[in-house]
Amino acid sequence: MAAEKQVPGGGGGGGGGGGGGGGSGGGRGAGGEENKENERPSAGSKANREFGDSLSLEILQIIKESQQQHGLRHGDFQRYRGYCSRRQRRLRKTLNFKMGNRHKFTGKKVTEDLLTDNRYLLLVLMDAERAWSYAMQLKQEANTEPRKRFHLLSRLRKAVKHAEELERLCESNRVDAKTKLEAQAYTAYLSGMLRFEHQEWKAAIEAFNKCKTIYEKLASAFTEEQAVLYNQRVEEISPNIRYCAYNIGDQSAINELMQMRLRSGGTEGLLAEKLEALITQTRAKQAATMSEVEWRGRTVPVKIDKVRIFLLGLADNEAAIAQAESEETKERLFESMLSECRDAIQAVREELKPDQKQRDYTLDGESGKVSNLQYLHSYLTYIKLSTAIRRNENMAKGLQKALQQQPEDESKRSPRPQDLIRLYDIILQNLVELLQLPGLEEDRAFQKEIGLKTLVFKAYRCFFIAQSYVLVKKWSEALVLYDRVLKYANEVNSDAGAFRNSLKDLPDVQELITQVRSEKCSLQAAAILDASDSHQPETSSQVKDNKPLVERFETFCLDPSLVTKQANLVHFPPGFQPIPCKPLFFDLALNHVAFPPLEDKLEQKTKSGLTGYIKGIFGFRS
C-alpha cells in the first residue's frame, strides 16, 4: 500500500479538484495523524525513474484498508470522505502538485507525462473514492430526503469519471499489467453501481460481470493470501448480479437472493434495501391468490394485504431461521420476523373498531366464539408470542453453553445463572399471555399443551435458581429446589402422552432429570464437606485471621486470599497513632511579682465646670 509522510498543518488550497468532496473535517488531524502514507512505495524508490520500469499500485488493497481504518467499518461514509480529502491534500503537497493557492484556483490534471511516480495514480484514485463515499453518504440520507437522490447520482457519475481517468492513465506502457487489470475492474465496479441506481439492469449486469471476471482471474494468478481480497470482492458483487438477473427476467435468481439473507450480516451496500423490497414485492404478488387461513380447526378469511404478505412469508422466515449459520444471523432474522408480525397485528387492530369489538365478539348466539377478525388477531398474536419464546429459548441455549465454558478473559463479565432466570421469566410470561388469547378459552387441547410447556420452562427456571443458591453455598435451599425440578419434570413425562410431538422442539426434560440427579449428589457431598470443615477444631493454620499480613508474620496461616487481587497485606489507609506534641509553658511566677507604684508619674486629672464644658465644645480646651 502506498504510504504518506506526515505533513504539518492541514490547510492550503490543494485537493479542491474533487467537486466539494472534502467538506467535513478537511483539515482535521492532517498534521496530527502519524502515518507514512505519502512516502513513495517500494516499487518506485528512485527519484528519477527510467521509463522502462513499471509503475505498480495495489488499488483494491489500498481502498479496502483505507475504508476499514477510516469509518466504513461502522458505515461512516462522511468520515471516510474527509479522510480522502486530507490524503489528497497531503499527496499534492508531497508531489508539489497543488491546485493554485488559497486565493486562486488553478486546475491541473494528471497526464501520462507525469507518470514517474505511482502516487500520481493514487491521487486520481482518491478523487474517485471521495466522490463515491459522498454518494454513499447521500444514499443513507436519501431515505428521509428524496431530493438528495439527484445529488447522489451526480456524485456517482463523478466517481465513474475519475475511475475512467485512472483506467486511461493505467493504459500507459509505464504501468504494469496487474495495475491495468485492477483499474479496469474498479471502473467496471463503479460503472455497475451507477447503472444499478439508474435501474439499467442489463448495463449494470454487464459491468458487474466484467468486474467479477477480472477479479476471479487475478485471484487465480496469485497466492492464496493475495487471492482472499479478490474473492471477497467477488462475493460482494454476486448479490448485485443476481438481483439484476431477476429484474431482467431470470425468475430462478430469487431463490439465490433469499439464500443470501442467511449469511451473517446479511447483504450490504446498494442491494440491502432493494432485496427487502423485492421479497416484499414477490410476496405481494402471491398474496393476491391467498384468501383464507386455517388454524386449530377453524378457517378465517384474510382480507388485509399486509397480513397476507406476512402469512405467505411465514414459512420462508422459519426456514431461514432454521438454516441460519450463526447466532447473529439468527437473532437478526428473529427480530425481522417479530417486526413484520407487529405490523400485521397493528393492521388488524385498525380494522377492529371498538364498537365492532363489542358487537362482533359473539356470533350466532354462541358464547365464546369470537369474530373472524378477532380470531385472526389471536392467531397473529400467537405467532408473535411463539416467536418471542423461541428467540429467548435460543438465547438461553447460548448462555448455557457460555456458562459451562471457562471464560478466556477474566476482565470480561461471564454469564451467571441469574441471566438465565430472567430469560425464563419472560418465557413464562409469554405463555401466560397465550392462555389468555380470545377464542381459545374452550380449547382444552391448547390449554393442556401450554400447561405442559409451562411446566418444562418452570423446571428449567427452578434449576437455575438452584444453581444460583449453590454458588452462595445455601445447600438446603438448593436441595429443595432440585427436588422441585424433579417434580415438574416427572409431571411433564407422565402427562405428555399425545402432546409429545408439540413438545419435541422444547428442551429435553429427561436430560434435565439426569443432570439434576448428578447435581444433587455433588451438592450433598459439598454440604457434608462444608459441615465437616466447620466442625473441625480451629488451628492456627485454619483460622482465617482478619489481621493484615504485615501484623502476622510470626504465624503460619494458609490464606488463599493472599494470591487474589483483594489480598489483605497492610492497613489502608493507615490508622491514627498518638505522637508527642510541642510542650506548653505557663509563666506561674508572674502572678507573684509585685510591681512598683506609678501614681507619681501619672498626670492628675483636674475637674472643670461649665466653663470647661463650653470651651470643649468650641475647641478652646487645651
Curated annotation (Swiss-Prot):
Keywords: Acetylation, Cytoplasm, Endoplasmic reticulum, Nucleus, Phosphoprotein, Ribonucleoprotein, RNA-binding, Signal recognition particle. The keyword Metal-binding does not apply. Disulfide bonds: none annotated. One of its GO terms (biological process) is SRP-dependent cotranslational protein targeting to membrane. Residues 564-592 are annotated as: Required for interaction with SRP72. Heterodimer with SRP72. SRP68/SRP72 heterodimer formation is stabilized by the presence of 7SL RNA. Component of a signal recognition particle complex that consists of a 7SL RNA molecule of 300 nucleotides and six protein subunits: SRP72, SRP68, SRP54, SRP19, SRP14 and SRP9. Within the SRP complex, interacts (via C-terminus) with SRP72. Belongs to the SRP68 family. This is Signal recognition particle subunit SRP68. It comes from Canis lupus familiaris (Dog). The gene is SRP68.
